């Protein structure tokens, strides 16, 4: 029976471990990565020491800390959105913010806590109650309120909750604006109702405007409620009254009944005229108005004096020599007689 042969191999130390991408993550440098996470989305944050867990949980209260592997590998799972309506609804650009000592900031600073806004918070109607009150106050931003009212007519939220919020908003706006349509939020509402351009929106416009007080109609709706003399005068013209009545051409179109608004659209513009009824601007906006002129000297804005034009043409025309013309005429006649 033969004996086996054993060979002793040289011993070598194993190669050092190569860290994975997850092991190289540092939760303290991931503020902008963690904050945008969607509901039930995991965000891997790398190895996390036990003594740092409480600090991370306090910084991200909307997330649940979960273990994902050996060596303290961890991840955060989004479970909620804790942003408040005043901080999320009064702007269309904010997705999250950091709160510290009662103050908020868009950038992280040590000791701050993350609060996130619900995705598409304006589209879902979650801001309706807050903005309805805020836009009637003294500190509202007119551009934000105008944009919010406009977005209400184009919401994609078809859930029962979203549709009910929209119905409630329309009802509250109709009640508020029927009392006084000059409130800024009501003027925006009427503007977007007009732009919506449906039979229902037209009926709501007319209903709201007809409910206005006598003082309101006298101040803002003289086109829609003309005097008897103005009505009698309108019988003399074939074109709609809205085309020549200054009370219509100078009126705020948001306060025109649908009939008057439509008639105004039938008018032909025969002069250069600009009328701005709704203008939303901020500190970065600029405005330029032009009537198609490249410079102020291209056309004269002074009324034409026809008599002066005729005199100018005569003065600069060629000088007629009547005696010379007479002699030439006689010469031509003589030549014709001789030739015959």
Curated annotation (Swiss-Prot):
Chief location: virion
GO process terms (BP): fusion of virus membrane with host plasma membrane; symbiont entry into host cell
Induction summary: Expressed in the late phase of the viral replicative cycle.
One Pfam family recorded for the sequence: Pox_G9-A16
Post-translational modification: Unglycosylated because produced in viral factories instead of the classic ER -Golgi route.
Lipid-binding residues (covalent, N-myristoyl glycine): 2
Transmembrane segments: 320-340
Key words of the record: Fusion of virus membrane with host cell membrane, Fusion of virus membrane with host membrane, Late protein, Lipoprotein, Membrane, Myristate, Signal-anchor, Transmembrane, Transmembrane helix, Viral envelope protein, Viral penetration into host cytoplasm, Virion, Virus entry into host cell
Compartments (UniProt record): Virion membrane
Gene Ontology cellular-component terms listed: membrane; viral envelope; virion membrane
Virion surface side, ranges: 2-319
Region (Disordered): 1-20
Membrane topology: Single-pass type II membrane protein
Superkingdom of the organism of origin: Viruses
Function: Component of the entry fusion complex (EFC), which consists of 11 proteins. During cell infection, this complex mediates entry of the virion core into the host cytoplasm by a two-step mechanism consisting of lipid mixing of the viral and cellular membranes and subsequent pore formation.
Protein family membership: Belongs to the orthopoxvirus OPG086 family.
Protein name per UniProt: Entry-fusion complex protein OPG094
């Amino acid at each position: 029976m033969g004996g086996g042969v054993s060979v002793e191999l040289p011993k070598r130390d194993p190669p050092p471990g190569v860290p994975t991408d997850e092991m190289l993550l540092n939760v303290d440098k991931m503020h902008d990565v963690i904050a945008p996470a969607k509901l039930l989305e995991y965000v891997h944050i790398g190895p996390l020491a036990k003594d740092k867990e409480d600090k991370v949980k306090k910084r991200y209260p909307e997330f649940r800390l979960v273990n994902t592997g050996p060596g303290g590998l961890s991840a955060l799972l989004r479970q909620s959105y804790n942003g408040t309506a005043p901080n999320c609804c009064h702007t269309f650009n904010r997705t999250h913010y950091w709160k510290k000592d009662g103050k908020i900031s868009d950038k992280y600073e040590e000791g701050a806590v993350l609060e996130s806004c619900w995705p598409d918070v304006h589209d879902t109607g979650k801001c309706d109650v807050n903005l309805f009150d805020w836009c009637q106050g003294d500190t509202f931003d007119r551009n934000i309120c105008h944009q919010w009212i406009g977005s209400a007519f184009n919401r994609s939220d078809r859930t029962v909750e979203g549709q009910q919020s929209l119905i409630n908003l329309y009802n509250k706006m109709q009640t508020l604006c029927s009392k006084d349509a000059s409130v800024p939020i009501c003027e925006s509402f009427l503007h977007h109702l007009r732009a919506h351009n449906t039979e229902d929106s037209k009926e709501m416009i007319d209903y709201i405007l007809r409910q206005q007080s006598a003082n309101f109609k006298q101040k803002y709706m003289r086109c829609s409620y003309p005097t008897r003399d103005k009505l009698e005068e309108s019988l003399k013209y074939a074109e709609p009254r809205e085309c020549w009545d200054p009370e219509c051409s100078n009126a705020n179109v948001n306060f025109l009944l649908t009939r008057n608004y439509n008639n105004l659209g039938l008018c032909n513009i025969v002069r250069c005229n600009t009328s701005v009824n709704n203008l939303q601007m901020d500190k970065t906006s600029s405005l330029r108005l032009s009537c198609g002129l490249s410079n102020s000297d291209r056309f004269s804005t002074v009324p034409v004096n026809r008599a002066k034009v005729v005199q100018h043409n005569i003065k600069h025309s060629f000088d007629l020599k009547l005696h010379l013309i007479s002699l030439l005429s006689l010469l031509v006649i003589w030549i014709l007689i001789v030739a015959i």
